[in-house]
Amino acid sequence: MAKMQAKVQQDERDDGLREKMISVNRVTKVVKGGRILGFAALTVVGDGDGRIGMGKGKAKEVPVAVQKAMDEARRKMVKVALKNGTLQHEVVGRHGAAKVLMMPAKEGTGVIAGGPMRAIFEVMGVTNVVTKSHGSTNPYNMVRATLDGLTKMSTPAEIAAKRGKSVEDILG
């Protein structure tokens, strides 16, 4: 089975969402009569202000697979609280054998992230972040691990509410 890593493409529709295609794979199903070829696409969609969604789509044609993935990403969007274009705090995300470490960075650092993680932060609106990935480099696992870490992130107000303290006590 051949694998095609598609160049990350960005598209913006009239709804203001940013779309990036992370990968397109050619897949085959072996049946009695031979092989059936198909394509699997992985995409992310974000609004540039902390909302992010991931989708995967499969079809016989590449454009149909990409469209299915984009539609799923739009349906599965989650909100992540950002702080001045970076993350609230250091966070680790895991999915399968993929483990990603994401750290907030000061202004001017830029997005220091590899592969699929960079696409996620760009469509999400994060401008300064430092990341490191360990383990699996499979694009799907890396995207899921990144989203896992981002959804675990808490704001100071949420932490203060859990502990029954004021935000000033939490921030020091």
Swiss-Prot record:
GO terms for molecular function: rRNA binding; structural constituent of ribosome. Residues 17-80 form the S5 DRBM domain. GO terms for cellular component: small ribosomal subunit. InterPro entries: Ribosomal_Su5_D2-typ_SF, Ribosomal_uS5, Ribosomal_uS5_bac-type, Ribosomal_uS5_C, Ribosomal_uS5_N, Ribosomal_uS5_N_CS, Ribsml_uS5_D2-typ_fold_subgr. GO terms for biological process: translation. Keywords: Ribonucleoprotein, Ribosomal protein, RNA-binding, rRNA-binding. Belongs to the universal ribosomal protein uS5 family. With S4 and S12 plays an important role in translational accuracy. Located at the back of the 30S subunit body where it stabilizes the conformation of the head with respect to the body. The N-terminal domain interacts with the head of the 30S subunit; the C-terminal domain interacts with the body and contacts protein S4. The interaction surface between S4 and S5 is involved in control of translational fidelity. Part of the 30S ribosomal subunit. Contacts proteins S4 and S8. This is Small ribosomal subunit protein uS5. It comes from Cupriavidus metallidurans (strain ATCC 43123 / DSM 2839 / NBRC 102507 / CH34).
